[in-house]
Amino acid sequence: MSQVILDLQLACEDNSGLPEESQFQTWLNAVIPQFQEESEVTIRVVDTAESHSLNLTYRGKDKPTNVLSFPFEVPPGMEMSLLGDLVICRQVVEKEAQEQGKPLEAHWAHMVVHGSLHLLGYDHIEDDEAEEMEALETEIMLALGYEDPYIAEKE
């Protein structure tokens, strides 16, 4: 049976009201075992300052963002199950959910699904890549019991 090992790091000034570790595990389990047998993923939940700093350093964007994905590149000849790290900004996720009229839990789930697909090599730079990735995200979110996260864009 496929297994995803979660290393959850809560690095917010206030960690109250965040999803439970079991929820993060459920969301990861809905994505990663479809693509590989055994994986280890770190999810770090941060405040805006850390998200802003990482986004500026690694993407050249001078603002915080919802989720950053850092895939782990295994050196040639080595076998490791470490897939990578997700850094999710609490305040951005909460603000986006409110602005988009989405349930907060569903938006958290979407950020984990979206980021996990990036760790697995999916991207949305080109239109055809975006369509494939969004279709997978929608399929996974529906399987988890949430609405299509892109429903507003399709209407």
UniProtKB/Swiss-Prot annotation:
Annotated cofactor note: Binds 1 zinc ion.
SUPFAM superfamilies attached to this UniProt entry: Metalloproteases ('zincins'), catalytic domain
GO molecular function: metalloendopeptidase activity; nickel cation binding; RNA endonuclease activity, producing 3'-phosphomonoesters; zinc ion binding
Induction summary: By heat shock.
Any GO BP: ribosome biogenesis
Main localization of the protein described in the UniProt heading: cytoplasm
A cellular component annotation (GO) from this entry: cytoplasm
PANTHER family: ENDORIBONUCLEASE YBEY, CHLOROPLASTIC
Protein family: Belongs to the endoribonuclease YbeY family.
Protein name: Endoribonuclease YbeY
Originating organism: Escherichia coli (strain K12)
The organism's taxonomic lineage, starting at the top: Bacteria, Pseudomonadati, Pseudomonadota, Gammaproteobacteria, Enterobacterales
Gene name, Swiss-Prot/TrEMBL: ybeY
